[in-house]
Amino acid sequence: MEKFKEIMDANQMRRALVRISHEILEKNKGVENLCLVGIQRRGVNLAKRIQENIEKIEGVKLPLGILDITFYRDDLSLLSEHPTVNSTRIDFDINNKKIVLVDDVLFTGRTVRAAIEALMDMGRPKMIQLAVLIDRGHRELPIRADYVGKNVPTSRKEIVHVLVDEFDNDNRVIIEQLDREI
């Protein structure tokens, strides 16, 4: 069996993000009070692409925030003694705003729970929605995405990698086959 299998190429990623952008606009009836927040790391890059798509469609550049959830993780003590902390930058008031959280892969739901907790510490949004490029299943918390690029049923012996130009000099999604369960 192959160790890596491509499940989305660059064009499929682009089309999925364009579709998600349209769905966000349709569900929210436009851009009023709408903001995007990308979850560090790759969620930020996907959020920027959604922001660009919406700007092309509506002619409006949505506010875009960057959220690091490291200190909100429920497994922080298991990660390492000195976890890598990225920056959080949300330069707009989130109170009474419709926030679309953007992440690359939805798996157990724990990252999203941490992101919601981090946002709630910053204010009281009117609504929080979730957009993900890949939903791979295996939820451990009652969390679901409002916008999904692709549902990809996986086993616990697989990891989904979303590759983006900004970090990987590539745009595609691959599944890695492991020898053990995660």
Swiss-Prot record:
GO terms for biological process: DNA-templated transcription termination. It catalyses: UMP + diphosphate = 5-phospho-alpha-D-ribose 1-diphosphate + uracil. It comes from the Bacteria. One of its GO terms (molecular function) is RNA binding. Its EC number is 2.4.2.9. InterPro entries: PRibTrfase_dom, PRTase-like, PyrR, PyrR_bifunctional. Coiled coil: none annotated. SUPFAM superfamilies: PRTase-like. Homodimer and homohexamer; in equilibrium. Regulates transcriptional attenuation of the pyrimidine nucleotide (pyr) operon by binding in a uridine-dependent manner to specific sites on pyr mRNA. This disrupts an antiterminator hairpin in the RNA and favors formation of a downstream transcription terminator, leading to a reduced expression of downstream genes. Belongs to the purine/pyrimidine phosphoribosyltransferase family. PyrR subfamily. HAMAP family: PyrR (MF_01219). This is Bifunctional protein PyrR.
